[in-house]
């Protein structure tokens, strides 16, 4: 029976409760006098029951007993290099190999050179990862200050970072950051840092030098929000200690002549072939070409003059393969590191800079340890009697043998030895201890393959065509300069916004008022604790073999730092408002804070106003409820 609307009485319900449940009903279309035919046919419309109204559900949370708003302000050196090193990746110095070279030891007296050269660690592009532990290490090196201490606080929240990029005089550069990444992506960052690729990245910022923009010399400020994996919920400092907050990279860029260079070097990068993995050749080789090291060791007579370097075995002027093997012991394990020698250019620069003064030659080998990416291309066993023989030990030409530097034991003069490719392999010595070669016969393909010898820049890209891709800085290599090139230094300033929370023990440390407590000299890192150990203390859980530990004694007897005079970097006495408070709030969300740029006559009022704005912002972020948000409680 069809459902019809009655012309009289009460209107019937669209849905009728029947034995089989609710049944759908359809409207009855009546003909209208004003339209007889319709272009589109009518469809039956269904009366549907309205769903249940979503009701908001309030989720409440409580903040810790005590809150501390902390701003970490400091600076980073992001690029350190010389002209001609823009294609090299910056790397930290290997203190064991590069910065500490013992050339003489007489009893307990050790003569060494502990200073490194810019060539050993410099580079025109760099990358890194920022974490709370890294900020603590920077504080110990006097490179940042903490407005409030984290000592005694168990919990922490992160609200983002602000970075200020300063333009240089003559060199433009790119700065890039990423907050969502994994460890595998971070290791594959070399190809992504090529200037033509990074120029298209979403989070990259181009900083033009002052020479190109003489009028607009403003400092560019960017805000980096917290990672998507983090929310504004509280976390223990031990959990957030090594969590990567963001990943960054910085690289020099050439905007005047991005495509061409002079005729002395091959630069037809647009003619390079496309590889099987989809990358262009100049992108594939970016960051994977080692520096051009010396092919000759220093003269033995000059190097051993005065009775030093007694373990230097070569005689005369010895030619070598440009990549040497540094053999040492780390953690009771024999390790081989590949490095290049740069005594030639540094000796040349020193003698030219001094002018009238007559300097002696260097008494140590200037070594630069190759990074993992620079040893990407290696010789195979089948190439020993092929391409490798044609270049480095031809039958009727000059031979470039393998050089090993044995730094075992640590506080002794290293042993420098040379191994000919045409001679027999000894049954004992360095080759047996570190490479397992002791056949006592001529070199074979299998013996050469066990070395895993990296390819030098002569074999990978001696013409420098790959490193001269689009937008790369095009300058002759630093090794070919007659005098020392000019340095390039780029640095940034940062401000991190954290909030520490917890409930520390009551202050029990009382100082003698008759004893002087000087503000100077500055006690830099006395009030900041490593995030891994922050908040740990007490007698029951911190008793070692010799009694109460140092951390427990400090927590029991020391007053909690809560003023500027007790902060990491001691400032002048200031009047503070009470920030440690109790509060009950709902979940909050991190919002980016901004600081205005400009100039003012009264700097004190400007700093005070900025401080009040930041305190008010952090207070609103911590105490803002979420009653106005509607959520469906479905669990």
UniProtKB/Swiss-Prot annotation:
Main location per the UniProt record: virion
Sequence similarity: Belongs to the anelloviridae capsid protein family.
Location in the cell: Virion
Superkingdom of this protein's organism: Viruses
GO cellular component: T=1 icosahedral viral capsid
Matches recorded under InterPro entries: TTvirus_Unk (IPR004219)
Entry annotated with the keyword Ribonucleoprotein: no
Composition-biased stretches (Basic and acidic residues): 573-584
Record's signal peptide: none
UniProt keywords, alphabetically: Capsid protein, T=1 icosahedral capsid protein, Virion
Region described as Disordered: spans on this chain: 571-608
Functional description taken from the UniProt entry: Self-assembles to form an icosahedral capsid with a T=1 symmetry, about 30 nm in diameter, and consisting of 60 capsid proteins. The capsid encapsulates the genomic DNA. Capsid protein is involved in attachment and entry into the host cell.
The organism's taxonomic lineage, starting at the top: Viruses, Viruses incertae sedis, Anelloviridae, Iotatorquevirus, Iotatorquevirus suida1a
Low complexity composition bias: residue spans: 585-597
Protein's recorded name: Capsid protein
């Amino acid at each position: 029976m069809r459902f019809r609307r009655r012309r009289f009485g009460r209107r019937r319900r669209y849905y009728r409760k029947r034995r089989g449940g609710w049944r759908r009903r359809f409207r009855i279309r009546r003909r209208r006098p004003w339209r007889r035919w319709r272009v589109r046919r009518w469809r039956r419309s269904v009366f549907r029951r309205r769903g249940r109204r979503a009701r908001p559900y309030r989720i409440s949370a409580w903040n810790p007993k005590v809150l501390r708003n902390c701003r970490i302000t400091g600076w980073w050196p992001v690029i350190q290099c010389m002209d001609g090193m823009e294609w090299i990746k910056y790397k930290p110095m290997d203190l064991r190999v590069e910065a500490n070279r013992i050339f003489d030891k007489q009893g307990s007296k050790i003569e060494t050179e502990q200073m490194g050269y810019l060539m050993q660690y410099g580079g025109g592009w760099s990358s890194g990862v920022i974490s709370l532990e890294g900020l603590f290490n920077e504080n110990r090196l006097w490179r940042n200050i903490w407005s409030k201490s984290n000592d005694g606080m168990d919990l922490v929240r992160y609200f983002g970072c602000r970075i200020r990029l300063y333009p240089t005089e003559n060199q433009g550069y790119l700065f890039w950051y990423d907050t969502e990444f994994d460890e595998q992506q971070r290791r594959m960052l070399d190809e992504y840092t090529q200037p033509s690729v990074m120029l298209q990245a979403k989070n990259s910022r181009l900083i033009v030098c002052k020479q190109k923009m003489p009028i607009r010399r403003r400092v560019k400020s960017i805000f980096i929000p917290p990672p998507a994996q983090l929310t504004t919920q509280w976390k223990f400092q031990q959990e957030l200690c090594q969590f990567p907050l963001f990943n960054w990279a910085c690289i020099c860029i050439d905007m005047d002549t991005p495509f061409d260079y002079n005729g002395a070097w091959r630069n037809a990068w647009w003619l390079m072939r496309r590889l099987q993995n989809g990358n262009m050749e100049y992108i594939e080789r970016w960051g994977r070409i080692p520096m051009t090291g010396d092919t000759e060791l220093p003269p033995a007579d000059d190097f051993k003059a005065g009775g030093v370097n007694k373990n230097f075995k070569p005689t005369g002027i010895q030619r070598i393969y440009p990549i040497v093997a540094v053999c040492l012991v780390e953690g009771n394990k024999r390790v081989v590191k590949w490095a290049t020698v740069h005594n030639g250019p540094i000796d040349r620069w020193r003698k030219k800079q001094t002018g009238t003064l007559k300097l002696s030659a260097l008494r140590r080998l200037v070594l630069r340890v190759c990074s993992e990416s620079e040893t990407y291309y290696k010789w195979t066993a089948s190439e020993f009697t092929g391409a490798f023989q044609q270049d480095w030990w031809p039958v009727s030409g000059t031979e470039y043998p393998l050089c090993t530097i044995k730094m075992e034991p640590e506080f002794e003069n290293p042993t420098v030895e040379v191994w000919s490719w045409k001679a027999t392999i000894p049954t004992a010595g360095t080759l047996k201890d570190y490479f397992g070669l002791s056949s006592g016969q001529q070199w074979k393909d299998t013996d050469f393959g066990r070395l895993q010898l990296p390819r030098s820049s002569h074999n990978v890209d001696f013409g420098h065509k790959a490193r001269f891709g689009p937008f790369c800085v095009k300058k002759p290599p630093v090794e070919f300069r007659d005098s020392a090139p000019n340095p390039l230094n780029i640095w940034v300033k940062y401000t991190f916004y954290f909030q520490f929370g917890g409930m520390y023990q009551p202050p029990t440390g009382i100082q003698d008022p008759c004893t002087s407590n000087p503000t100077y000299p500055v006690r830099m890192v006395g009030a900041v604790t490593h995030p891994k150990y922050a908040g740990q203390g007490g007698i029951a859980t911190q008793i070692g073999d010799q009694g109460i530990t140092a951390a427990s004694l400090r927590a029991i007897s020391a007053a909690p730092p809560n003023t500027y005079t007790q902060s990491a970097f001691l400032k002048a006495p200031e009047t503070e408002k009470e920030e440690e408070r109790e509060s009950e709030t709902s979940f909050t969300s991190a919002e980016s804070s901004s600081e205005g740029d400009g100039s003012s006559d009264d700097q004190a009022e400007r700093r005070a106003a900025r401080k009040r704005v930041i305190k008010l912002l952090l207070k609103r972020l911590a105490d803002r409820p979420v009653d106005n948000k509607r959520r469906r409680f479905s669990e």
